[in-house]
Protein backbone atom coordinates (compact mmCIF):
# COMPACT_ATOMS: atom_id res chain seq x y z
CA UNK A 1 0.00 0.00 0.00
CA UNK A 2 3.00 2.28 -0.39
CA UNK A 3 2.60 2.36 -4.18
CA UNK A 4 2.05 5.80 -5.68
CA UNK A 5 -1.59 5.54 -6.72
CA UNK A 6 -4.22 8.17 -7.42
CA UNK A 7 -7.07 5.79 -6.64
CA UNK A 8 -9.63 7.09 -4.14
CA UNK A 9 -10.96 4.51 -1.66
CA UNK A 10 -14.37 6.18 -1.36
CA UNK A 11 -16.92 3.83 0.17
CA UNK A 12 -19.64 6.46 -0.21
CA UNK A 13 -19.43 5.72 -3.93
CA UNK A 14 -19.23 9.37 -4.97
CA UNK A 15 -15.74 9.33 -6.51
CA UNK A 16 -15.87 8.59 -10.23
CA UNK A 17 -12.84 6.30 -10.15
CA UNK A 18 -14.40 4.25 -7.33
CA UNK A 19 -17.62 3.87 -9.33
CA UNK A 20 -15.60 2.64 -12.31
CA UNK A 21 -13.73 0.20 -10.13
CA UNK A 22 -16.80 -1.37 -8.59
CA UNK A 23 -18.71 -1.52 -11.86
CA UNK A 24 -15.94 -3.08 -13.94
CA UNK A 25 -15.01 -5.66 -11.26
CA UNK A 26 -18.58 -6.93 -10.90
CA UNK A 27 -18.95 -5.67 -7.35
CA UNK A 28 -21.77 -3.30 -8.32
CA UNK A 29 -24.23 -3.40 -11.18
CA UNK A 30 -22.85 -1.59 -14.20
CA UNK A 31 -23.63 2.12 -13.96
CA UNK A 32 -24.67 3.27 -17.43
CA UNK A 33 -23.87 6.88 -16.59
CA UNK A 34 -20.13 6.17 -16.24
CA UNK A 35 -18.07 7.37 -19.18
CA UNK A 36 -15.23 5.23 -20.55
CA UNK A 37 -15.99 2.26 -18.31
CA UNK A 38 -13.00 -0.14 -18.36
CA UNK A 39 -13.51 -3.52 -19.99
CA UNK A 40 -13.04 -5.52 -16.83
CA UNK A 41 -10.66 -5.44 -13.89
CA UNK A 42 -7.41 -5.96 -15.81
CA UNK A 43 -8.21 -3.01 -18.06
CA UNK A 44 -8.91 -0.87 -14.99
CA UNK A 45 -5.67 -1.89 -13.26
CA UNK A 46 -3.65 -1.19 -16.40
CA UNK A 47 -4.79 2.42 -16.35
CA UNK A 48 -4.59 3.33 -12.65
CA UNK A 49 -3.50 6.96 -12.25
CA UNK A 50 -0.45 7.94 -10.22
CA UNK A 51 -0.60 10.20 -7.18
CA UNK A 52 2.54 11.98 -8.36
CA UNK A 53 4.52 10.87 -5.30
CA UNK A 54 7.48 8.53 -5.33
CA UNK A 55 6.73 4.90 -4.57
CA UNK A 56 7.45 3.86 -0.99
CA UNK A 57 6.99 7.26 0.64
CA UNK A 58 3.38 7.27 1.85
CA UNK A 59 0.87 4.62 2.94
CA UNK A 60 -2.32 4.85 0.89
CA UNK A 61 -4.91 2.10 1.26
CA UNK A 62 -6.14 1.12 -2.18
CA UNK A 63 -8.13 -2.04 -2.89
CA UNK A 64 -6.96 -2.26 -6.53
CA UNK A 65 -3.41 -2.79 -5.25
CA UNK A 66 -4.59 -6.11 -3.79
CA UNK A 67 -6.28 -6.98 -7.08
CA UNK A 68 -3.00 -6.23 -8.82
CA UNK A 69 -1.21 -8.59 -6.44
CA UNK A 70 -3.66 -11.33 -7.42
CA UNK A 71 -2.89 -10.64 -11.08
CA UNK A 72 0.85 -10.86 -10.39
CA UNK A 73 0.28 -14.25 -8.73
CA UNK A 74 -1.58 -15.43 -11.84
CA UNK A 75 1.23 -14.31 -14.14
CA UNK A 76 3.91 -15.94 -11.98
CA UNK A 77 2.07 -19.26 -11.66
CA UNK A 78 0.37 -19.33 -15.06
CA UNK A 79 -2.82 -20.27 -13.26
CA UNK A 80 -6.01 -18.64 -12.02
CA UNK A 81 -5.78 -16.91 -8.66
CA UNK A 82 -8.56 -19.03 -7.17
CA UNK A 83 -6.82 -22.23 -8.27
CA UNK A 84 -3.55 -21.13 -6.67
CA UNK A 85 -5.37 -20.17 -3.47
CA UNK A 86 -7.14 -23.52 -3.37
CA UNK A 87 -4.13 -25.74 -4.16
CA UNK A 88 -1.49 -23.99 -2.05
CA UNK A 89 -3.54 -22.74 0.92
CA UNK A 90 -7.13 -23.93 1.28
CA UNK A 91 -6.62 -27.66 0.63
CA UNK A 92 -3.44 -28.12 2.72
CA UNK A 93 -5.08 -26.07 5.49
CA UNK A 94 -7.86 -28.68 5.57
CA UNK A 95 -10.72 -26.23 5.20
CA UNK A 96 -14.11 -27.85 5.71
CA UNK A 97 -16.49 -25.88 3.49
CA UNK A 98 -16.71 -24.44 -0.01
CA UNK A 99 -15.65 -20.85 -0.58
CA UNK A 100 -16.64 -18.36 -3.27
CA UNK A 101 -14.86 -15.58 -5.10
CA UNK A 102 -16.21 -12.65 -7.10
CA UNK A 103 -15.37 -12.59 -10.82
CA UNK A 104 -15.64 -9.69 -13.21
CA UNK A 105 -17.70 -10.22 -16.36
CA UNK A 106 -14.62 -11.53 -18.17
CA UNK A 107 -13.84 -14.10 -15.47
CA UNK A 108 -11.02 -12.32 -13.61
CA UNK A 109 -10.82 -13.05 -9.86
CA UNK A 110 -11.19 -10.12 -7.49
CA UNK A 111 -8.54 -10.82 -4.86
CA UNK A 112 -9.07 -7.53 -3.00
CA UNK A 113 -12.30 -8.47 -1.29
CA UNK A 114 -14.32 -10.89 -3.34
CA UNK A 115 -13.80 -14.01 -1.23
CA UNK A 116 -16.52 -15.39 1.04
CA UNK A 117 -15.56 -18.15 3.46
CA UNK A 118 -17.18 -19.86 6.45
CA UNK A 119 -16.37 -18.61 9.97
CA UNK A 120 -14.84 -21.97 10.90
CA UNK A 121 -12.53 -21.93 7.88
CA UNK A 122 -11.55 -18.31 8.45
CA UNK A 123 -10.62 -19.23 12.02
CA UNK A 124 -8.59 -22.16 10.68
CA UNK A 125 -6.59 -19.84 8.43
CA UNK A 126 -6.16 -17.29 11.21
CA UNK A 127 -4.90 -19.97 13.59
CA UNK A 128 -2.53 -21.23 10.88
CA UNK A 129 -1.07 -17.73 10.74
CA UNK A 130 -0.70 -17.57 14.53
CA UNK A 131 1.11 -20.92 14.38
CA UNK A 132 3.65 -19.40 11.97
CA UNK A 133 2.21 -21.16 8.94
CA UNK A 134 2.27 -24.77 10.16
CA UNK A 135 -0.39 -27.37 10.97
CA UNK A 136 -0.40 -31.17 11.14
CA UNK A 137 0.26 -31.26 7.38
CA UNK A 138 3.56 -29.47 7.94
CA UNK A 139 4.52 -25.96 6.91
CA UNK A 140 1.92 -24.35 4.62
CA UNK A 141 3.01 -20.69 4.76
CA UNK A 142 6.71 -19.77 5.07
CA UNK A 143 7.43 -18.80 8.67
CA UNK A 144 9.85 -16.10 7.49
CA UNK A 145 7.06 -14.37 5.56
CA UNK A 146 4.79 -14.27 8.61
CA UNK A 147 7.61 -13.02 10.84
CA UNK A 148 8.28 -10.26 8.33
CA UNK A 149 4.88 -8.63 8.87
CA UNK A 150 4.43 -9.57 12.54
CA UNK A 151 7.64 -8.07 13.91
CA UNK A 152 7.99 -4.28 14.24
CA UNK A 153 9.87 -2.50 11.48
CA UNK A 154 10.16 0.99 9.98
CA UNK A 155 6.65 2.49 9.92
CA UNK A 156 7.47 5.94 8.53
CA UNK A 157 5.36 5.39 5.38
CA UNK A 158 2.37 4.29 7.46
CA UNK A 159 2.66 7.30 9.76
CA UNK A 160 2.84 9.62 6.73
CA UNK A 161 -0.69 8.76 5.57
CA UNK A 162 -3.19 11.60 5.18
CA UNK A 163 -5.67 10.49 7.84
CA UNK A 164 -4.04 8.44 10.59
CA UNK A 165 -7.06 7.26 12.59
CA UNK A 166 -6.33 3.55 12.90
CA UNK A 167 -3.36 2.31 14.97
CA UNK A 168 -1.38 5.58 15.40
CA UNK A 169 1.66 3.57 16.53
CA UNK A 170 1.10 0.75 14.08
CA UNK A 171 2.12 -0.32 10.62
CA UNK A 172 0.80 -2.21 7.59
CA UNK A 173 2.59 -4.88 5.61
CA UNK A 174 1.61 -7.89 3.48
CA UNK A 175 -2.10 -7.12 4.01
CA UNK A 176 -1.84 -7.24 7.82
CA UNK A 177 -1.81 -4.46 10.41
CA UNK A 178 0.70 -4.26 13.22
CA UNK A 179 -1.44 -2.72 15.94
CA UNK A 180 1.31 -1.09 17.99
CA UNK A 181 -0.42 -2.34 21.16
CA UNK A 182 2.41 -4.52 22.41
CA UNK A 183 2.84 -8.29 22.55
CA UNK A 184 3.16 -8.14 18.73
CA UNK A 185 -0.63 -8.12 18.38
CA UNK A 186 -1.58 -7.97 14.71
CA UNK A 187 -4.81 -8.08 12.77
CA UNK A 188 -6.59 -8.10 9.42
CA UNK A 189 -9.56 -5.84 8.76
CA UNK A 190 -12.39 -6.00 6.23
CA UNK A 191 -15.17 -3.55 5.57
CA UNK A 192 -18.54 -3.91 7.32
CA UNK A 193 -16.93 -5.27 10.48
CA UNK A 194 -14.76 -8.24 9.50
CA UNK A 195 -11.73 -8.88 11.74
CA UNK A 196 -8.95 -11.32 12.45
CA UNK A 197 -7.11 -10.53 15.68
CA UNK A 198 -4.03 -12.42 16.84
CA UNK A 199 -2.03 -12.11 20.04
CA UNK A 200 0.88 -14.53 19.56
CA UNK A 201 2.21 -14.10 23.09
CA UNK A 202 -1.13 -15.13 24.63
CA UNK A 203 -1.74 -17.79 21.93
CA UNK A 204 -5.01 -16.03 21.15
CA UNK A 205 -6.82 -16.03 17.79
CA UNK A 206 -10.12 -14.20 17.30
CA UNK A 207 -12.27 -13.76 14.23
CA UNK A 208 -15.27 -11.50 13.89
CA UNK A 209 -17.82 -11.59 11.09
CA UNK A 210 -20.37 -8.85 10.69
CA UNK A 211 -22.77 -7.18 8.29
CA UNK A 212 -22.52 -3.69 9.76
CA UNK A 213 -24.26 -1.02 7.71
CA UNK A 214 -21.21 1.26 7.56
CA UNK A 215 -18.24 0.03 5.51
CA UNK A 216 -15.91 1.67 8.04
CA UNK A 217 -16.74 3.00 11.50
CA UNK A 218 -13.63 3.97 13.44
CA UNK A 219 -15.46 4.29 16.78
CA UNK A 220 -16.91 0.79 16.47
CA UNK A 221 -13.48 -0.51 15.47
CA UNK A 222 -11.88 1.08 18.53
CA UNK A 223 -14.51 -0.54 20.75
CA UNK A 224 -13.97 -3.98 19.24
CA UNK A 225 -10.19 -3.67 19.40
CA UNK A 226 -10.50 -2.80 23.09
CA UNK A 227 -12.59 -5.94 23.60
CA UNK A 228 -9.99 -8.07 21.79
CA UNK A 229 -7.18 -6.57 23.89
CA UNK A 230 -9.08 -7.17 27.14
CA UNK A 231 -9.65 -10.82 26.23
CA UNK A 232 -5.90 -11.12 25.81
CA UNK A 233 -5.25 -9.31 29.09
CA UNK A 234 -7.50 -11.80 30.88
CA UNK A 235 -5.36 -14.71 29.72
CA UNK A 236 -2.42 -15.71 31.89
Ranges and model annotations:
Residues 216-236:
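Short, gly/Ser/Thr-rich active-site loops of penicillin-recognizing serine hydrolases
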Residues 85-86, 91-150:
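Active-site-proximal binding-pocket segments
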Residues 1-17:
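Short helix- or helix-capping micro-motifs
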Residues 2-3, 65-72, 113-134, 194-210:
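Active-site-proximal alpha-helical segments within enzyme catalytic domains
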Residues 1, 42, 46, 70-74, ...:
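Non-transmembrane alpha-helical segments in soluble domains
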Residues 3, 7, 132, 152, ...:
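Phosphate/oxyanion-binding loops and surfaces in catalytic or ligand/nucleic-acid-binding neighborhoods
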Residues 12-106, 110-113:
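Catalytic-site signature segments of enzymes, centered on catalytic residues
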Residues 95-100, 147-207, 215:
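Active-site Gly/Thr loop motif
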